[in-house]
Amino acid sequence: MQTLQTTSLRVSENQLFILDQQALPQEKRWLAADNVALLVDHIHALRVRGAPLIGLSASLLLALLAQRGLNRDALQQALETLRAARPTAVNLMNNLDRMKQALAREDYPQALEAEALRLVEEDKQLCDRIAEAGSALVKPGSRLLTHCNTGGLATAGVGTALGVIALAHRQGKVANVWVDETRPLLQGGRLTAWELGELGVPYQLITDSMAASLMAQGQVDAVWVGADRIAANGDVANKIGTYSLAVLAHYHQIPFYVAAPQTTLDRYCPNGAAIPIEQRAAAEVTGVAGSFGAVQWAPMGAAVYNPAFDVTPAGLVSGWVLDSGVVTPAQVAAGAFAPDNG
């Protein structure tokens, strides 16, 4: 396969490497991900994360395995194992559905490579279109609040919600970005803060519980988040804490926008209640660990509830910013995300 490089993925000498997002921002470390078990472990450990990026990494690995001579049955088994690696992120399923079609072809090694590379290029283009559509909604002098990480670290391109913010900044419309630290794994504090710093976008890091106070003071003009899955009725599964922000924004009459590619739509999922929510390890809540070290602050054996995602009802969303353009609440209510409109 040809050499390929994005912010977080690299293909070199027929091997897949991922940027270890658990080591950032203290260390920029690339890790091999050249077999299924290893990539699944990276996904579970969130060394590779972001719904679009997970789907792309799985697709690229399948293509590389085919280049190494794995037969169709072995590749099918690998595909199913990868498919189960992150149940909430529908981009993974959508990408692998396309790879499955390529696997059915007689020339499947070549077809898988072509499809994986096509998915990467499409993701870059989708991100650009999302940024263009979303930046038109950003008013000059805006103070924006964002949650988790939705930039180039999570996609092959400029990102989704963070891509919107970055383009709006280049257009001179962003006064400040409030970055939720995003407990418990601090993707905002570690990753989004790092990306915004690299892009030269002015930001201030806050704890998740500070958002309400800022909104009450009139310090937030809009909230921008990404999505891991969008149901047919417009409900949005995203990083835990997103629902809280949506409720706060609604109360304070602040626009709440969801930026995502159409590959994040699950038109056959009727509503948020049907979206599987991944439950994660207690250790993520009882302490913290990373390249900076490890510490535990909760009592040993403390009972923990740790869902990775929550669901924001469609009624709290001001607009869904897709690569096809901005979709309004009225359009969603009229069936814009229904199966027969796909």
UniProtKB/Swiss-Prot annotation:
Enzyme nomenclature, EC number: 5.3.1.23
Which residues does UniProt mark as catalytic? 228
Question: Which pathway does the database say it acts in?
Answer: Amino-acid biosynthesis; L-methionine biosynthesis via salvage pathway; L-methionine from S-methyl-5-thio-alpha-D-ribose 1-phosphate: step 1/6
Q: Where is this site: Transition state stabilizer?
A: 148
Q: Which domain of life is it from?
A: Bacteria
The UniProt keywords, alphabetically, are: Amino-acid biosynthesis, Isomerase, Methionine biosynthesis
Q: Name one GO molecular function term.
A: S-methyl-5-thioribose-1-phosphate isomerase activity
Q: What does this protein do?
A: Catalyzes the interconversion of methylthioribose-1-phosphate (MTR-1-P) into methylthioribulose-1-phosphate (MTRu-1-P).
Please identify the protein, giving its name as recorded. Methylthioribose-1-phosphate isomerase
